[in-house]
Regions:
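Membrane-embedded beta-barrel scaffold of Gram-negative outer-membrane proteins
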Residues: 67-95
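Flexible loop and strand-edge segments within Gram-negative outer membrane beta-barrel domains
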Residues: 19, 23-61, 88-93, 99-108, ...
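Gly/His-enriched, cation/cofactor- and phosphate-binding structural elements
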Residues: 110-113
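Transmembrane beta-barrel wall of Gram-negative outer-membrane proteins
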Residues: 1-31, 59-66, 115, 121-128, ...
Length: 190
C-alpha cells in the first residue's frame, strides 16, 4: 500500500472583530486489493485465492474549507464554505481463477459544495437568538465496466447522481425562566 497526505491551515485576523480561516487537506492511497476466493457450496470453506489479473484500489480525496467570522455589537455573523472532491478507482478480478474471464472496474468521481451562514446574538441578556441558512450540492458520477475476456465484450453502466438541498433555521433561548438556571429553547427548521 502506498499512501500520503498533506494538510494546511491558514488564519488571518485583519481587524479585532474580523477573522478568516482556510483549511485544505489532500489524501492519496494506492493499494492492491480484494483477496476473494470461490466458496465450496458443500463444505462452505473458501478455496485458494488465485488471480491472474492485478486487483487494485486507488483513491484521491481533497477537502477545502473557508471560514469568515465577524463580531458586531450585540451580534456575530459566521460563514462556513466547503468543497470536497473524491476520485475513486477499483479493479477486481472477479472470476476467482487463474484464467482471464471477468474483470470489473468502478470509477467514481464525487464533488460536494456546501455553505452555511448564520447570525446570532451575543448580548449578555436573558434572551438569545440565532438565524441561519444552509445549502449544499453534490454530484456523483459513477462508471462500472465489466470486461468479458472470453467473449471480447464489455458492458458499461453510467450513473449520475446529483443531490442538493437548502435549509433555513431559527433558534430562540430564554435563560432563567421561572427560576435561575432553567432555560427554554425553541427552534424551527425548514
Amino acid at each position: 500500500m502506498k499512501s500520503g497526505s498533506a494538510r494546511i491551515r491558514l488564519e488571518w485576523k485583519p481587524q479585532k472583530n474580523l477573522s478568516f480561516g482556510l483549511m485544505s487537506s489532500f489524501d492519496r492511497s494506492v493499494q492492491g486489493g480484494y483477496p476473494y476466493a470461490v466458496c465450496d457450496s458443500v463444505t462452505h470453506k473458501p478455496g485458494e485465492v488465485d488471480y491472474n489479473d492485478y486487483s487494485f484500489y486507488k483513491r484521491t480525496l481533497s477537502t477545502t474549507g473557508f471560514s469568515a467570522d465577524y463580531q458586531g455589537t450585540g451580534y456575530s455573523i459566521n460563514s462556513r464554505t466547503a468543497f470536497q472532491y473524491l476520485s475513486d478507482h477499483q479493479g477486481i478480478d472477479q472470476d476467482f481463477s487463474p484464467r482471464s474471464i471477468y474483470f470489473a472496474r468502478q470509477d467514481m468521481k464525487q464533488k460536494m459544495f456546501s455553505e452555511e451562514l448564520n447570525i446570532k446574538s451575543t448580548t449578555p441578556g436573558r434572551y438569545k437568538w440565532l438565524f441561519g441558512a444552509f445549502g449544499f450540492w453534490q454530484g456523483i458520477d459513477n462508471t462500472v465496466t465489466l470486461d468479458y475476456f472470453t467473449k471480447d465484450y464489455a458492458t458499461r453502466k453510467l450513473y449520475d447522481t446529483p443531490a442538493y438541498g437548502v435549509a433555513f433555521y431559527h433558534q430562540s433561548t430564554i435563560d432563567d425562566l421561572l427560576t435561575r438556571g432553567l432555560s427554554l429553547t425553541f427552534g424551527i427548521r425548514y
